[in-house]
Amino acid sequence: MATSVSTIGAANKAPLSLNNSVAGTSVPSTAFFGKTLKKVYGKGVSSPKVTNRSLRIAAEEKDADPKKQTYSDRWKGLVQDFSDDQQDIARGKGMVDSLFQAPTGTGTHHAVLQSYEYVSQGLRQYNMDNTLDGFYIAPSFMDKLVVHITKNFLKLPNIKVPLILGVWGGKGQGKSFQCELVFRKMGINPIMMSAGELESGNAGEPAKLIRQRYREAAEIIRKGNICCLFINDLDAGAGRMGGTTQYTVNNQMVNATLMNIADNPTNVQLPGMYNKQENARVPIIVTGNDFSTLYAPLIRDGRMEKFYWAPTREDRIGVCKGIFRTDNVPEEAVIKIVDTFPGQSIDFFGALRARVYDDEVRKWVSGTGIEAIGDKLLNSFDGPPTFEQPKMTVEKLLEYGNMLVQEQENVKRVQLAETYLKEAALGDANADAINTGNF
């Protein structure tokens, strides 16, 4: 019988004894195979009560065949792997190097996925779905925004990625709305700014606000949530529209601040303080109608990547299908409406849909009475009125569309401002109505 002896008391180097008992033969240290301990006491000892200052405790191996006992060892799973997922995908074929084994409960020897689940996940492909809640996102628009935002979070070797993406194009083409759809698609809650915040009565306030919003977005990214800074109509707040606008200190500071952030995106400081810790890089998305009004060094290629948004016929049809998606307008009717007004912006079709409700509102006003409109809308216990969805036919939509086009033409053709400057009276203000017989 092999026993291992532990000693208590550093001063006594002789074998310890209890009631004049002699210690057994010591056993060299070996791997511990057993799962139980057996205490051995000397002859004449009936209880483990200690009466002397010395004590001997021996551990004894259980009488068992070492080969048979190894297969019943509870730690065997750390070396050998018999789980279904490992065998099915032929990774190790039941034997996995202990280097890749984790502690019990977290190791690869616990089956998590079957082989068909591994295959299904491996075959899963990324789908560039360009719809969100029934709204259409132009593929080229989504591609530009997604690639730009993704590039700014990647560390590409020896590549300088522009921090700012400038989306510009004609009025009412849905630039801001398309950006918001892409943000929602990517799960981004952007930090928003508008052109009205780029001017202030105090010099330097807009530039400071840009830095504050940028650092706010950087803090969101530091916490693990993707974010970006979105500035609407940058050219309206920081651009120069000929002689109609005055170039102020704040215009200059806004352009200079954006240039500085684009050059040092991870070192954006607030005025009056300096923090050595770098902030996260935040991609900036700006929209506008004409970037030629901006400061030229700001829009150079190294700082701003420019994207001209001009929706194609397919894009216009896709967006209009989203506008009329709840009105049961057939696709053929939407295509006909888009082709009838090819030169109109996308915003035109939203205004066209709103015009259809004019008849319903007019009926409610005539039934309620003009004097009681305020009470019915604001002070009624029943709340504001609700309308049944009017039926939208192609004929009605085309009729209202032609009315909107005529109003646009009147604004461009009549130009009363020039007449007012020339004469004190109306002059030819009513000439258009007289010629058309509507005077």
Curated annotation (Swiss-Prot):
**Record note on what altering residue 211 to S does:** In clone PTA1.1
Report whether Transcription regulation shows up as a keyword of the record: no
A Pfam match: AAA
Q: Where is the protein situated, by its record's location annotation? A: Plastid, Chloroplast stroma
An annotated GO cellular component = chloroplast stroma
Give the stretch annotated as transit peptide in the record, renumbered to this chain.
Answer: 1-58
| Lipid biosynthesis is among the record's keywords | no
Q: Does the entry annotate any disulfide bonds, and if so which pairs?
A: none
Q: Which UniProt keywords apply?
A: ATP-binding, Chloroplast, Nucleotide-binding, Plastid, Transit peptide
Give the source's domain of life in one word.
Answer: Eukaryota
Q: Tell me which residues bind ATP.
A: 169-176
GO terms (molecular function) for this protein are: ATP binding; ATP hydrolysis activity; ribulose-1,5-bisphosphate carboxylase/oxygenase activator activity
Give the function comment from the record: Activation of RuBisCO (ribulose-1,5-bisphosphate carboxylase/oxygenase; EC 4.1.1.39) involves the ATP-dependent carboxylation of the epsilon-amino group of lysine leading to a carbamate structure.
Q: Which family does it belong to?
A: Belongs to the RuBisCO activase family.
Q: What is this protein called?
A: Ribulose bisphosphate carboxylase/oxygenase activase 2, chloroplastic
Show the taxonomic lineage.
Answer: Eukaryota, Viridiplantae, Streptophyta, Embryophyta, Tracheophyta
